[in-house]
């Protein structure tokens, strides 16, 4: 993995996968940064639960978020070299997760106040971060 610093004086610019440079304030950077933030919060939720299904599901979602962030952090040249682009099978996977959770917990009929335990609280924060990422796309 490359260093976290470049020592080149970025002047507010960052490189995309593929080599082009854009402003760090560009909406594209904000979008993939928000996905990274959601992924980190899922990691926190993962660390707070011992339930195998939840841990496996979080891990699978994290892998997909890494792929999504890579796509969002790429220019046209860079995206052509990526493996495992997000596709319909990923959407189906997430829909199945939602269906399984709904079967387990029942259909939501009212808003839930977060804070039951650390894992569920972290999942609620991750949910709101993902909603923000949606608005950024």
What is the role of each PLM region?
Residues 1-137:
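Phosphate/pyrophosphate-binding loop motifs in nucleotide- or prenyl diphosphate-using proteins
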């Amino acid at each position: 993995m490359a260093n976290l610093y470049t020592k080149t004086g970025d002047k507010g610019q960052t490189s995309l996968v593929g080599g082009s440079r854009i402003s760090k304030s560009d909406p594209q950077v904000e979008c993939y940064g928000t996905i990274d933030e959601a992924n980190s919060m899922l990691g926190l939720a993962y660390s707070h639960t011992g339930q195998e299904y939840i841990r496996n599901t979080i891990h699978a979602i994290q892998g997909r978020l890494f792929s999504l962030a890579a796509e969002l952090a790429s220019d046209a040249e860079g995206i052509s070299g990526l493996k495992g682009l997000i596709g319909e099978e990923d959407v189906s996977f997430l829909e199945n997760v939602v269906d399984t959770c709904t079967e387990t917990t029942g259909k939501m009929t009212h808003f839930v106040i977060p804070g039951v335990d650390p894992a569920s609280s972290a999942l609620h924060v991750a949910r709101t971060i993902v909603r923000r990422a949606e608005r950024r796309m």
